């Protein structure tokens, strides 16, 4: 009975071990490939739990999602004979699920070593061998990533279709310390030069700004002066027009006044001409004699009132020449009076 129990225990252990080795799990984003007796089987499996023959069948999980392969410490000799090292080169790639079997069959499950790592070493050495340290370290460094990606993808398209390179990232290479210090000094001087150039641009920009401000200020002053000059010219023109209008009005008034005076004089002359009739002259004579308070004596006094009209006119004319001949200049002869 003891032997039977031992056999059962051994059988149970063997069964459990067989079951444990037969059941396996494939993670999401991976494809399982199987080997039996060292030969790759054509069947593959997706994510999940699967069974296989225990002890004689083995499997490997191949990632089909994006993965990053790192190639470290890649030596590279430039055309000038300087040895430099790239610390780390990252290659982002993914494998198409349908191409897993062919790639694993041709390049094993560690296909990245044959297709990516070796190719990176080869392409970098070719690139460095035809370029100087200045070009590799500074001038063409930004092109290394894209050149490696294109070269890798071109070879993989013909050698391993289904393996896609998405991106390549290259770190700055390590160069000899003396050369590195020279480059740092050169970069420092270049930075100083750039700073000086930027300062010069700033100064030039400020000077240009000041010049534009001065130009704008001068234009403003000129415009103000032009406007002020225009205003003064308009004021003078207005004053001139006002003066011309006033002069014209004054001339018109004076002319009208002169015309009126001339007209008045003409009318007075015409009226006087019409008034100088014998009857009017005789009336004026009588008024003059009547208004004279002095009495004249002489033989011609009665005749003054008895002359004809023609004689009166002549006497009046003579009187007008001698201030009406009424003795305005000569002293009158007064008759002597007797006192009672």
Curated annotation (Swiss-Prot):
Glycans are attached at residue 106. The chain crosses the membrane at residues 4-24. GO terms for cellular component: cytosol; endoplasmic reticulum membrane; membrane raft; plasma membrane; protein-containing complex. It is found in: Endoplasmic reticulum membrane. It is a single-pass type II membrane protein. Residues 1-3 are cytoplasmic. Residues 177-309 are annotated as: Interaction with ERLIN1. Deubiquitinated by USP25; leading to stabilization. The modification N6-acetyllysine is found at residue 267. InterPro entries: Band_7, Band_7/SPFH_dom_sf, Erlin1/2. Belongs to the band 7/mec-2 family. Component of the ERLIN1/ERLIN2 complex which mediates the endoplasmic reticulum-associated degradation (ERAD) of inositol 1,4,5-trisphosphate receptors (IP3Rs) such as ITPR1. Promotes sterol-accelerated ERAD of HMGCR probably implicating an AMFR/gp78-containing ubiquitin ligase complex. Involved in regulation of cellular cholesterol homeostasis by regulation the SREBP signaling pathway. May promote ER retention of the SCAP-SREBF complex. This is Erlin-2. It comes from Mus musculus. The gene is Erlin2.
